[in-house]
Regions:
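Proline- and Ser/Thr-rich low-complexity, intrinsically disordered segments
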Residues: 1-254
Length: 254
């Protein structure tokens, strides 16, 4: 505090709000010399003060941009914490803890981290963009089909895509349960699971494979005898619609 009867002079004056008062406000680093003069006897005294500066900003690193997927529905962002810094993230929606260096997020957006150096109050900011890829693949197990005596196996499914993997269940009755279009030879309900390699998203579809191997009825009729009076006979039984008939040998038949 100023003493009555004394005058005050600070040097240099640069960086001071008033170089001629006892307690000026300083805003620049440097070595300041104070000269105090007694107005009555003209005696002087001097003293110095060193004003240093610490305005080093902390490092703010929100980390690289990332993508949420079905395989990775949550991600950690940011980088390792530095002692003496505080961390504040925004927005906070979808975030595990907005006041740590490396929170976990579940929502796609652009997140900004503000890092404050507790020692000097300096702050820095950085941002990271989180996108999302949860587009499911297409699963097509194909149309329901029926195994028969003439069609004992056939292909199911649809043409595959190199960006997907394929898995059929059950595997029994299939030549390869990891193909997009396996060959089936046994009746069952087959479930196809298609997984997108890039995002891990899955889609399923089913196909019903039935079997019809019921044989038709073959009835050649009762044994008969050709005679002089019965030189020909009708053999067999009445035809059934949908059946075809073949006799061997053909010699002697109309």
């Amino acid at each position: 505090a100023a003493v009555a009867g004394n005058t005050y002079t600070w040097s240099p004056a640069f960086g001071l709000d008033n170089a001629n008062i006892a307690q000026p406000v300083v805003s620049s680093p440097g070595t300041y010399t104070l000269t105090v003069t007694n107005s009555i006897n003209g005696c002087t005294a001097t003293d110095q003060i060193v004003i240093s500066q610490n305005i080093t900003a902390p490092a703010a690193n929100a980390g690289p941009n990332k993508t949420l997927t079905c395989a990775n529905p949550s991600l950690q962002i940011g980088t390792a914490a530095i002692a003496g810094n505080t961390y504040t993230w925004s927005p906070t929606a979808g975030m595990s803890n907005p006041n740590i260096a490396q929170p976990t997020i579940t929502i796609p957006t652009t997140y900004t981290v503000t890092v404050k150096n507790s020692a000097n109050g300096c702050i820095s900011t950085d941002a990271v963009t989180i996108s999302q890829n949860i587009t499911p693949p297409t699963a097509n197990a194909g149309a329901d089909k029926t195994l028969t005596c003439t069609n004992t196996s056939f292909t199911i499914g649809a043409p595959g895509n190199a960006s997907n993997t394929y898995s059929w269940s059950p595997a029994t009755g299939l030549d390869d349960a990891t193909l997009a279009q396996p060959i089936v030879s046994a009746p069952n309900t087959y479930t196809l699971t298609v997984t997108n390699i890039t995002n891990g998203c899955k889609t399923t579809d089913q196909v019903l494979i039935s079997r019809n191997i019921t044989p038709p009825t073959a009835n050649a009729g009762a044994d008969k005898t050709l005679t002089c009076t019965n030189t020909s006979h009708v053999i067999g039984t009445t035809a059934v619609v949908g059946n075809s008939y073949a006799w061997t040998p053909a010699t002697g038949l109309d």
